[in-house]
Amino acid sequence: MRSVWKGCFYKNNNNGLSKSSTVINTMLKKKFTLHDGKSYKSILIDRSMVGLKIGEFVFTRKMGVLHKKKVLKKKGKK
C-alpha cells in the first residue's frame, strides 16, 4: 500500500505504460500498450480497474501444457 502523501505512481514509457503504474480516473476508456516480456498487449481501461496497478491485467507467465502419459502396448505371449 502506498502512502497517501506520495500520491499515485504514474510513469509513461515510449511504447506504453509501466506495469507498476496505478490506474487513475483520467485513463478511463483509453487504450494502452503493455509489455508482457515477449510482446506488447493492448488494454482498454474501464471503471472497475481504477485504483489497481496496470500490471495486474497482463499475464507474464507462460501457461504449462499437460501431456497425457503414453501407455506401452504389451506384445502377446506365445
Swiss-Prot record:
PROSITE patterns (UniProt xref): RIBOSOMAL_S19 (PS00323)
Protein's UniProt name: Small ribosomal subunit protein uS19m
Keywords, comma-separated and alphabetical: Mitochondrion, Ribonucleoprotein, Ribosomal protein
Major location category of this protein: mitochondrion
Record's subcellular location: Mitochondrion
Gene Ontology biological process terms, A to Z: translation
Pfam family, one: Ribosomal_S19
Gene Ontology molecular functions: RNA binding; structural constituent of ribosome
The family this protein is said to belong to: Belongs to the universal ribosomal protein uS19 family.
InterPro entries: Ribosomal_uS19, Ribosomal_uS19_CS, Ribosomal_uS19_SF
A GO CC term assigned to this protein in UniProt: ribosome
Native source species: Acanthamoeba castellanii (Amoeba)
HAMAP family in UniProt: Ribosomal_uS19
